Amino acid sequence: MKCYTKTIFHEESSKSPKGMDRWLYPDMVGVRFLHAEWSNENLIAFSKKFDTLPIKLVSFELKKEISVHNCRECYFQAISNSSWANEGYLVGRHIDTHNPQLMDLLKRLHASFGIGVIDLRTNEDKSAILLNAKYKEKINYTVALELSTKNEKFSGFLKSVVDYDPDFPNRYKDEFDEVKKKEELYPNPSLSF
């Protein structure tokens, strides 16, 4: 999934009465510029003139660990703060995929609510989308407005999406999060998971 992402720090958001914004902010948002992946210039031009540009807004809730004990809470937090996007994902650094109870629970929640699940590992080959998010044609503009009003980074992310030009991708490298290599994140291999 080639996705340009931006980390959203809820600590940098405007303050509301205690508890009002609980589970409002996703940990990370992303965008896929599907038209930038096309190689046919005529198709790109056609899309720009007669169609809406094919993009996909994605929202992520990140968790260190997802277990049977915290699965529902993690999943419902992901529903709360990621359902506004075209696709929402719950991302776990450690998901015991060999636990049938956990996997069954995730599948049932996914069938009901459509939030996808990603098992994230430092070894890219071991990372996996366990359950694809159900795609929603339209984003929830009410929630997107609230997020952009309360968080400058989210508002800036939306501006970067609007301004993005696939012919000049380097211009946007500072506007989206840098994707670091595993060696930069974990210089000591014994610390990777």
Identify what each model region corresponds to.
Residues M1-S39, F193:
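Acidic-basic catalytic patches of nuclease active cores, encompassing PD-(D/E)XK
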Residues L105-F193:
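Non-catalytic C-terminal interaction segments of nucleic acid-processing enzymes
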Residues W23-Y25, L53-L57, W84-A85:
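Short connector loops at helix/strand junctions that flank enzyme active sites
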Residues E73-F76:
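Charged helix-capping and loop-helix junction motifs
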Residues N81:
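Ligand-binding face of N-terminal immunoglobulin V-set domains in extracellular IgSF glycoproteins
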Residues I66-C71, W84-E124:
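Nucleic-acid nuclease catalytic cores
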Residues N42-S47:
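Intrinsically disordered, low-complexity Ser/Thr- and acidic-rich flexible linkers and loops
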Residues M28-N40, P54-S67:
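Conserved catalytic cores of phosphodiester-cleaving nucleases, focusing on short active-site segments
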